[in-house]
């Protein structure tokens, strides 16, 4: 079990490329933290600095109050699972899982106990005598997880462990890793570019862009209260819709739209002196409904109707704006069809058009 403190962490390479910039985060014991962001945002580099595989250029890394900057990787009490399984093909599942413990010269009885315990948790007992070539991708990933589990480390680090699996296996392994966290009751830090993995697995999500932390929070918080337009657009699938316009009286207006703003949001916009200035309204696809209400109704034309089974994703054109609408599958929708959509303005978000920071 472990607490981590990352204080003003920096990573600067010899060519002066600044990959991680002033990273600050307190991680409590037993948390499941997910670093998420696009490729090149610095999430894997940060993980590797925690593991001791990358040198920290500036700042301090503390584990249970002890400064770890100069402590070698093998002495940090950390276990890591990589994107590639990195299994020894000539060894059995048992020997792959036991290899690290044998290198530490741990007693055979202890090794046997730990390997069998991990295999039981991961559903690998019947595969212990097989070699990796006889396993599926999901089973190989479980072996890689098992190899980390048997170390009984204080912190588990996972660097995009599911990216090599097909879609169905990823969903299955996502749930298995969440269950594993509950069983082990230990601190886990997980890196992914997949916001769905972040939303479904994390205690808290750390969203990064260009080496800078954009927001830290529980999944529901970052989804419902994004700190800026990047977070709002990155978290959620399909992404949040954005419309540029201005505030005129109690209306959000563009050249073709006029939508009434709820009083609570309008009061915040007034205190932030956002009236008559360029502003961006954001609204999620599920907060635009294909049925008319008393106000905030707009005519839209469907360009693409995607049926996912339980619902439709409607790609529509609304007064020159491209908007995605999430609709139930009770009705049929077709490309070229004209529909009336309703904006639930109680759920909309407003961002400063210049800074892209959330206003309300």
Swiss-Prot record:
Gene3D superfamilies for this protein: 2.40.50.100, Nucleic acid-binding proteins (2.40.50.140), P-loop containing nucleotide triphosphate hydrolases (3.40.50.300)
Organism: Escherichia coli O6:H1 (strain CFT073 / ATCC 700928 / UPEC)
GO cellular component terms, semicolon-separated: ATP-binding cassette (ABC) transporter complex, substrate-binding subunit-containing
Coiled coil listed as a keyword: no
Domain ABC transporter, first and last residues per copy: 4-235
Molecular function terms from GO: ABC-type transporter activity; ATP binding; ATP hydrolysis activity
Upper taxonomic lineage: Bacteria, Pseudomonadati, Pseudomonadota, Gammaproteobacteria, Enterobacterales
Keywords linked to the UniProt accession: ATP-binding, Nucleotide-binding, Transport
InterPro entries: AAA+_ATPase, ABC_transporter-like_ATP-bd, ABC_transporter-like_CS, ABC_transpr_MalK-like, ABC_transpr_MalK/UgpC-like, Mo/tungstate-bd_C_term_dom, NA-bd_OB-fold, OB_MalK-like
Cystine pairings recorded for this chain: none
Gene Ontology BP terms: carbohydrate transport
Pfam families: ABC_tran (PF00005), OB_MalK (PF17912), TOBE (PF03459)
Similarity comment text for this entry: Belongs to the ABC transporter superfamily.
Protein name per the record: Uncharacterized ABC transporter ATP-binding protein YcjV
